[in-house]
């Protein structure tokens, strides 16, 4: 397994792989890997000859300095996990390598509308940071396929639109959420939970499941469903942050034409922000 830290060496390797006719899969990550990431790697192996994982804690997508400072950085441990999964290349650049002229002078890639609604409304600039760095990774790696988890559902939809709008010749493969036995979605932030908080954390999934059951039964009173879910979270020690029910394809409010809904939930448990999502068929 090659560990590459510079764009110069990465481009050299990509050129060689392309000349050899290799099919390339990219799995972009911010490190601190868990079972969800490893599922992405396993799926990538099915779709390509060469699997490349990037590890980069992207400062452009953080809207709080404290979050950036506290984000776990576990490069050595991550590389051991990726080696065990037979990843071919790990691209682990520094911020200086990715933004040599500084972020304030960086050309921006931003998907309109989708980036400013739902979670984007309360985190201005977050998705712009995501799409900017992902577009840079796409240009550097030139993958045939790229894999993203469905837990960050709005991010997934934004990246799909960016790929379509900018004519990237890349197939985006969504990978279902990986959960532990309690239903809690694997997340890099789970490590930040105390022992007591880990016992409370599955309530987020349970609240989402309650909404899903109501939607399946035909209850489309979105406001009532969200109020009930938020009350459940607050009673269990959470601070509800972002809770939405919308059309899974457009991220617009549900309508009579909606065939599939998506539940998007984010809540604080102590000092840790947890997110989750679930799609629900309405037909």
UniProtKB/Swiss-Prot annotation:
InterPro entries: Cyt_trans-like (IPR004821), Pantoate_ligase (IPR003721), Pantoate_ligase_C (IPR042176), Rossmann-like_a/b/a_fold (IPR014729). The keyword Zinc does not apply. It catalyses: (R)-pantoate + beta-alanine + ATP = (R)-pantothenate + AMP + diphosphate + H(+). ATP binds at residues 30-37, 149-152, 178, 186-189. The active site is at residue 37. Pathway: Cofactor biosynthesis; (R)-pantothenate biosynthesis; (R)-pantothenate from (R)-pantoate and beta-alanine: step 1/1. Disulfide bonds: none annotated. NCBIfam families: cyt_tran_rel, panC. Homodimer. The reaction proceeds by a bi uni uni bi ping pong mechanism. This is Pantothenate synthetase. The lineage of its organism: Bacteria, Pseudomonadati, Pseudomonadota, Gammaproteobacteria, Enterobacterales.
